[in-house]
Amino acid sequence: MTTLTQSTTWKALQTHSSQLPHMRELFAQNPQRFEQMSVAACGLFLDYSKNRVNDETLKLLFSLAKEAKLSEKITAMFNGDVINNTEQRSVLHTALRSKATQTIIAEGANIVPEVQQTLAKMAKFVGSVQSGEWKGYTGKAITDIVSIGIGGSFLGPKIVSQALRPYWQEGLNCHFVANVDATSICEKLKNLNAETTLFVMSSKSFSTQETLTNTLSAKDWFLGQGASQQDVAKHFVAVTSNVTKATEFGMDANNIFPMWDWVGGRYSLWSAIGLPIALLVGMDNFTALLDGAHQMDQHFADTPIEQNMPVIMAMLSVLYGNFHGAQSHVILTYDHYLRGLPAYFQQLDMESNGKSVTLDGTDVDYSTGPVIWGGEGTNGQHAYHQLLHQGTALIPADFIMPLQSHNPLGEHHDQLASNCFGQTQALMQGRTYDEALAELSNSKLDEQQKPLIAKHKVMVGNKPSNTLLMDKLTPTTLGALIALYEHRTFVQGAIWQINSFDQWGVELGKQLGNDVLERIGADHDATDLDGSSNALVNLYRKGKL
């Protein structure tokens, strides 16, 4: 057994968690529950009162965090200590949104000047594209950007760009390509004009299979539209560490933006990987995005854990995963622009904390990362919310909503907000059998049917949720929101004693994919894989069933 599960606090939480009354009773016992269980920081407001906790629960959770030396681990990350022990790397995505006056050491050097130089280089490039100064090979300004990446190099820029749609530069559009499925890039290129299209290729090595394949196909398309090899530099730029390969491809060394080993892919949107975001919304808004994240960094680093928003959210997740048997967590965004956030947080959390050994290689004997999923309100209310209300699985929920809409049309936002708050109330409160039966008292149902229907209308409630609010969705509040979930993910990993910053499962998938590709391209049937894989490869080689 691990030391975590043998701790006195862990065992106390196991006992305590099974003894709490229903949340209805917790609210009845404490009229000040909302005021005592809410916190504001960095333009965000968190109501966590609709959780299965009382003062004693929170005390135990914070004790668990202290036993895990959470504060020391937070300091170690911000200081650039090598906390990614399997790859021997610092974890300094926070440095990407630091201020120019700060000093942050990685590998023996202050990395802040290099970060600031990259931002300045981005600003110059973004300004030239947005102003129309940057011309394509026929002298026309850029109208379309195609961002080519995979994983964090794709999902972060895409979701943030989608969320900041009200801030896009007029006349500029962006198209995101990640999947190696040819349909993805073919559909994107179908209606584009090569003369006015700019490609941004993001790959640290300039050799990531999906990204390189898509970039080569984009180049073939570009040349096929009448352009020449010497025109490539006007239409292709890269975010990469491999300047040699990028220049061999035809890119100008002046239009190659750096990546660093101390930034993981799923934390990289704050770096030059965010170039597509900056091209769309402008450098001022990109800087505001960084500033929102920096504000959350400061809150996370400096605030006592009892009032620390990322810590509170993380410890609640630990509570449900380790002491209530929850296997998933749902993110529900009540804002159309934020509809992509569940997928982004899914990658952030599951790639980080989908681990089964501790930092020292011990097999864990407790649950780690949950399945993260979700969608857009109110759509989900007519689908999977049914399972949240009456299913047998406990699924904690995060509701995220701005108080003000970018599109204030009639009563739309009032209805959206009422649905959001109503769902949190319904999950917490539920409906008893007596309440259901009373609601049916004036119905036209046969008296013998009413007890049966009432039974089907019962909802046990006591389903936990957080509500996250902001005045309005802006670059600053979005930056703070994303950083909040980054730090929440870190805290969970710190409690579970796992490495949240490697991804060996992803690496194995890449390795085996390349092995299979060799068999597909061979001049004979596959025989040296497992029986199923051999058969699938050979069936694919035939091209038909």
From Swiss-Prot:
Catalytic machinery residues: 351, 382, 510
A Pfam family name for this chain? Answer: PGI
Q: Which pathway is this protein assigned to?
A: Carbohydrate biosynthesis; gluconeogenesis; Carbohydrate degradation; glycolysis; D-glyceraldehyde 3-phosphate and glycerone phosphate from D-glucose: step 2/4
Specify where it is mainly localized.
Answer: cytoplasm
Task: List the InterPro entries.
Answer: G6P_Isomerase, G6P_Isomerase_C, Phosphoglucose_isomerase_CS, SIS_dom_sf, SIS_PGI_1, SIS_PGI_2
UniProt GO molecular function: carbohydrate derivative binding; glucose-6-phosphate isomerase activity; monosaccharide binding
Whether Disulfide bond counts among this entry's keywords is: no
Cellular component per GO, a single term = cytosol
What EC numbers are recorded for this enzyme? 5.3.1.9
Q: Name one GO biological process term.
A: glucose 6-phosphate metabolic process
Q: Which UniProt keywords apply?
A: Cytoplasm, Gluconeogenesis, Glycolysis, Isomerase
Where in the cell?
A: Cytoplasm
Family the entry assigns: Belongs to the GPI family.
Q: What job does this protein perform?
A: Catalyzes the reversible isomerization of glucose-6-phosphate to fructose-6-phosphate.
What name appears for this protein in its UniProt entry? Glucose-6-phosphate isomerase
- Species this chain originates from: Shewanella frigidimarina (strain NCIMB 400)
- The gene name reads pgi
